[in-house]
Amino acid sequence: MSFEGKIALVTGASRGIGRAIAETLVARGAKVIGTATSENGAKNISDYLGANGKGLMLNVTDPASIESVLENIRAEFGEVDILVNNAGITRDNLLMRMKDDEWNDIIETNLSSVFRLSKAVMRAMMKKRCGRIITIGSVVGTMGNAGQANYAAAKAGLIGFSKSLAREVASRGITVNVVAPGFIETDMTRALSDDQRAGILAQVPAGRLGGAQEIASAVAFLASDEASYITGETLHVNGGMYMV
């Protein structure tokens, strides 16, 4: 599974799942451009990618910022072959208390950004008759979660968006898929109390949290030639927490 000669764009690549994805694609030969919301985050990405890529600052809710980043990538590396939409935020609240900005921020960052970025790379992929668009969803997008109506709506929306786009571009050799993680070991989960952690693990038949590398491996498979006949799918990586 080699990505030699491929250019990959991974949003939200400064840490966690995004960083694991970027490092996995680099290890398999791709040139990777990772994005962050701050200059310091972009520098950190450049530092860990080294000669194999670059970190850039990107506001995924701003069309001008997206176009600027893509122009930078074209000038230095060429057109994007693999787009990984990983950037996302949470603004949790019960619906009765949820403010409009808590709803709108999540939809703009977690859903509308995927529309903008996918559209921005589409023309070049269609010309090459090859491309991979992989979006990081969530188990919450399928099963729902109290206090996350905004987040669940955005993550569910990604699935419908990806299925529709997959139908539009399949004849051009472009695949569009979603990877939906369950509970993944992160800085946030490591800070949980023993009781909180036990409550989470009780929902997972595998009896453990997932690792960021396990999500990255799923992304790498869907980005590969081996997955060229898989499109419009959601790959659930959740230890059996939710079985579709």
From Swiss-Prot:
Residues at which Ca(2+) 2 binds: N145
Broad class of enzyme this protein falls into: oxidoreductase
UniProt keyword list: Calcium, Fatty acid biosynthesis, Fatty acid metabolism, Lipid biosynthesis, Lipid metabolism, Metal-binding, NADP, Oxidoreductase
SMART domains, sorted: PKS_KR (SM00822)
Residues the entry annotates as binding NADP(+): G12, A13, S14, R15, T37, N59, V60, N86, Y151, A152, A153, A154, K155, I184
Annotated gene: fabG
Assembly, per entry: Homotetramer.
Family: Belongs to the short-chain dehydrogenases/reductases (SDR) family.
Annotated binding of substrate, by residue: S138
Enzyme Commission number(s): 1.1.1.100
Record: residues binding Ca(2+) 1: G50, G53
Catalytic activity: a (3R)-hydroxyacyl-[ACP] + NADP(+) = a 3-oxoacyl-[ACP] + NADPH + H(+)
Ligand binding (Ca(2+) 3): E233, T234
Entries under NCBIfam families matching the protein: 3oxo_ACP_reduc, PRK05653.1-1, PRK07231.1, PRK12824.1, PRK12826.1-2
GO biological process, one term: fatty acid elongation
Involved pathway(s): Lipid metabolism; fatty acid biosynthesis
Record PROSITE patterns: ADH_SHORT (PS00061)
MF term (GO), any: NADP binding
Active site (catalytic residues): Y151 (proton acceptor)
InterPro entries assigned to the protein according to its UniProt record, in alphabetical order: 3oxo_ACP_reduc, NAD(P)-bd_dom_sf, Sc_DH/Rdtase_CS, SDR, SDR_fam
SUPFAM superfamilies (alphabetical): NAD(P)-binding Rossmann-fold domains
Highest taxon listed in the record's lineage: Bacteria
Role summary: Catalyzes the NADPH-dependent reduction of beta-ketoacyl-ACP substrates to beta-hydroxyacyl-ACP products, the first reductive step in the elongation cycle of fatty acid biosynthesis.
The name this protein goes by in its record: 3-oxoacyl-[acyl-carrier-protein] reductase FabG
Pfam families to which the protein is assigned, alphabetical: adh_short_C2 (PF13561)
